[in-house]
């Protein structure tokens, strides 16, 4: 189904490719998914917003593509079940042609509590129309969370960093010779769930995370975290396609160590996107 702008007469229309789950409803611009009190929404015309997660007074966003709004053109898009694809052009000096495929409820979901869990994956693709260009793109996640803990899956084992992070400025660069998966597990306020973000060392360049006190939060111990994952080289050539992916999983905090390890292990064993 092709994407078209919604008019006031069809804002409640659902597509003929609804996912099998009753909680997932799509229209001509994106979809809405509900899990208990949590609502996840995606609008393909706003790739920078990614997937918004709202529950009560708490609002977070995951898997937003950082594209310059003043030079951004939304060229095309479509919805197929729980997958949404958007095609974008940047009409600036970089002349990038970028696509994002957002997918809900993939193979990463915690199986022991699937009704209260959510999995989202973004596959990011980009190339340039110039002979050479800066190809770096960031995917942004913005959370209100109490703490974040980092961990890494490498050589068949998962290692958690011993200390959790609160107010911080965090930077990491991919340097592993084998495929490693980095995990950022955010403890969300107001309900007992953890949101974990996973990236692969062979597809990501570096990650930057900052945090400040969340003044607008109803939880006094909450912080606002901004996680930016940077993909693709700073110099790319015309005719060469670059592709990377990032996964976010929402699951119960009481079993986060188990399902984070399982998700990281499964993600590490996936074949490369470009071979």
PLM-predicted stretches and their roles:
Residues 180-275:
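Beta-strand-rich recognition/accessory modules
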Residues 108, 124-130, 141-147, 233-235, ...:
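Beta-strand elements of well-folded, non-transmembrane domains
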Residues 25, 29, 36-38, 47, ...:
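Extended, loop-rich substrate-binding clefts of extracytoplasmic carbohydrate-active enzymes
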Residues 113-167:
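Acidic (Asp/Glu-rich), glycine- and aromatic
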Residues 12-21:
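Preference for solvent-exposed, low-hydrophobicity sequence contexts
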Residues 156-190:
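Low-complexity, serine/threonine/proline-enriched polar segments
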Residues 104-106, 118-122, 227, 244:
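Hydrophobic residues positioned within well-ordered beta-strands of beta-sheet architectures
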Residues 1-10:
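Intrinsically disordered, low-structural-confidence terminal and linker regions
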